[in-house]
Amino acid sequence: VWDYLDTAVSPGRIARGQDRWYEVRPLAEAAATRYGVPATILAAIWGMESNFGSNTGDIPTIDALATLGFDGRRAAWAREQLLAALRILQSGDIARERMIGSWAGAMGQTQFLPTNFLAYAVDADGDGRRDIWGSMADVLASTAHFLARAGWQAGQSWGLEVRLAPDFDVGRADADVRQSSMRWAAEGVRSMDGTALPELPDAAVFLPAGARGPAFLVGANFRVLLRYNNATSYALAVGLLAQQLAGGPGVQ
């Protein structure tokens, strides 16, 4: 996990992100106000998915999905995505030559699959098109809409790094063992700076590198990030990148 985080939350990415953050902050904050998802979380997903817009993929989406449609393992899924991509073209949101992305059919600056585009993409700038390739207002609002619909709890943290008491039962560090941060505090879970833990009604202790590595207390919004990409290392990277874009610490 640390090799992944070293790349995902590298000093270079943080520096680039802080520069780009100042450019898009008003748009991110508008999306945050509308959907209740923190602006820094939106910026962090943008950073993770396309390195703040510098790498959105260059493969024509229709071609990528048509090719995958002949892959026996994912053929049915790819055909569903291909039909969704054709509906996007039919709607006039994007021209075919601009519909580019990854080899797996993910598109735009925050890498939406076509079915997710149809369900969650937003025309935030009011130009009549949902443009997640070129309009940062649309990119950030669409990402916020996805997270809000996935269950993001407004006003609640994704989680934080914590210290565990020496006698903490690491067997309780399990995604299925959930309770309030207050109850975790009673078991010896402490914030890194000694302040009170944030209110997390349904939190779990997460040890991404095992009992000897850093510990995190993660809440419902961490699980929402897994709806965007179902890898705990990804969700942790988004949370840590958001924290550092806001001037906070990395892993201590």
Residue ranges and their predicted role:
Residues 125, 129-182:
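Ligand-binding pocket segment of bilobal, Venus flytrap-like solute-binding proteins
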Residues 162-252:
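C-terminal soluble interaction/assembly domains
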Residues 1-142:
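Acidic/His-rich structured neighborhood in mature extracellular/periplasmic domains
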